[in-house]
A protein has these predicted regions:
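Radical SAM enzyme core and accessory elements
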Residues: 7, 278-439
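PDZ/PDZ-like groove recognition
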Residues: 1-12
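Short, Lys/Arg- and Gly-enriched loop/turn segments at beta-strand edges
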Residues: 35-42, 61-64
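Conserved PDZ fold ligand-binding element
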Residues: 19-37
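Structural preference for beta-strand elements that scaffold enzyme active sites
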Residues: 147-149, 185-187, 218-220, 266-268, ...
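Conserved Radical SAM active-site core
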Residues: 61-62, 69-215, 225-254
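Terminal peptide-recognition signature
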Residues: 17, 25-28, 53, 97
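Flexible glycine/acidic-rich beta-alpha junction loops that bind and position SAM and/or redox cofactors
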Residues: 196, 216-242, 261-285, 358-363
Length: 439
């Protein structure tokens, strides 16, 4: 197999790499005489005040660049392959895996299951640790790469093997202990499945993982997502409002213990639990800086707080404006209330909030981030949309104007014949977009 070459894709403006005349198409061969395996090696070897970088130019010439810099100063290089190596796929067959629940006919990358520790550091992905060798763990410790985000799900070894359908999954506590002993900061995640790892099993898991605090900085508990495409898969049941209330009670009990010991709440319930239980969201101080927001923990609280702060800073006026807002079923009531607050302050602003039901994955999928272009198009055609449609950015692929079903933003814009304003994931941008501000 041909060895991966580390080809430069982009050189940042005013960077060391630009100063040293490194250009797109160049290949980084060595740093300080060391061959580079992947992004771990690269980041480790550039952390010095003096480095020597061997570069091969497109014409075959090799340059040895001597660089003086600050210890932790980056070179300003982006590579064609962000990992600088092949991606590691998942070895598990988790009973709750959402990728297995995708409908047929989607783009190939949607079906790829990654479980690569390097993506944990680069992108914040959560990994199970089951495909890591001892030398991989030792390498993370040696390079002190952090934080590492771990999909734990349960600390019961036998149960974890069953849930992940992997006979090697039961060593999770040993792995976490090694990271704890080395002082490697961690975050954890539990995908909760009714009747499987909830109740007493959840209590056990939280208690065990709290033993790694404060090195393990946070733990999120999220409900399993259940689509309509589960034929032949493990039977899973949705949680009801009573279940949600029980989960919250368990978590909040441990939060009190954690706060007394560590000064943080440690374990957090995702927003979905509070909405389904009909309970108010905790205050911002309960989220410990929103360390788990990417897992749906504190999104509503953060959005609302930012929204009210931004709205309070804008003086009321008599502008006339009509717009529409797309949202998923889960947070519809919250978004509707925020829209009403804008209408109260700006008497001539009219906002239509549309709750989009997820026909693509199934009606049990209620989060906004899994809405597709075709569902939005189908459910908004013929509706009053006003001067613009506000669309949350998490409905689109990162850095691309494309939905999960491969519909493009231009196709949706053409179908609905309306200006589309992409709302960033903060309350201030929601206010700005709703009253006609520029993006």
């Amino acid at each position: 197999m041909k060895k991966q070459e580390h080809v430069v894709k982009k050189v940042l403006e005013d960077s060391i790499a630009q100063e040293m005349e490194i250009e797109p198409g160049d290949v980084i061969l060595e740093i300080n005489g060391n061959k580079i395996v992947d992004i771990f090696d690269y980041q480790y070897y550039i952390e010095d005040e003096y480095i020597e970088v061997l570069v091969r130019k497109p014409d075959g010439d090799e340059w040895l660049l001597e660089i003086d810099k600050d210890y932790d100063e980056d070179l300003g290089i982006e590579f064609e392959n962000s990992l600088m190596d092949d991606y590691k796929s998942c070895y598990n067959k988790c009973i709750f895996c959402f990728i297995d629940q995708n409908p047929p006919g989607m783009r190939d990358t949607i079906y790829f299951k990654d479980d690569d520790s390097r993506l944990s550091f680069l992108q914040g992905n959560y990994i199970t640790l089951t495909n890591m060798k001892d030398e991989d763990v030792d390498r993370i410790i040696r390079y002190h790469l952090a934080p590492i985000n771990v999909s734990v799900h349960t600390t019961n070894p036998d149960l974890r093997c069953k849930m992940l359908k992997n006979r090697f999954a039961g060593t999770i506590m040993d792995r976490l202990q090694k990271f704890y002993d080395a002082g490697i900061p961690m975050n954890g995640q539990i995908v909760l499945c009714k009747g499987i790892n909830d109740g007493d099993e959840l209590r056990r898991s939280i208690s065990d993982l709290m033993g790694f605090a404060p090195v393990m900085e946070s733990l999120s508990v999220v409900p399993v997502g259940i689509s309509d495409y589960r034929d032949g898969l493990f039977k899973l049941e949705p949680f009801d409002s009573r279940d949600a209330a029980e989960v919250i009670d368990i978590i909040e009990g441990f939060q009190k213990q954690a706060y007394e010991k560590f000064g943080t709440h440690f374990v957090h319930a995702s927003d979905e639990w509070y909405i389904n239980a009909g309970r108010p969201m905790p205050g911002a101080e309960n989220y410990d800086g929103y360390t788990q927001i990417e897992n749906g923990v504190g999104m509503v609280r953060s959005l609302c707080d930012e929204f009210y702060e931004a709205l309070g800073e804008i003086p009321a006026d008599d502008r006339e404006y009509t717009a529409s807002i797309v949202t998923g079923v889960l947070v519809y009531d919250h978004i509707k209330k925020l829209a009403e607050e804008i209408e109260k302050k700006f008497k001539n602003v009219k906002l239509h909030v549309y709750k989009i039901v997820n026909d693509f994955f199934g009606h049990r999928i209620t989060v906004t981030g899994l809405l597709t272009g075709q569902d939005i198009k189908k459910q908004l055609q013929g509706k009053e949309l006003g001067s613009r449609l506000l669309l949350p950015e998490n409905t689109l692929k990162c850095d691309e104007e494309i939905f999960l079903d491969d519909m493009t933003l231009d196709e949706l814009r053409e179908a609905l014949q309306v200006e589309i304003y992409i709302v960033k994931s903060n309350g201030a941008d929601l206010v700005n977009g709703a009253i006609g501000g520029n993006s």
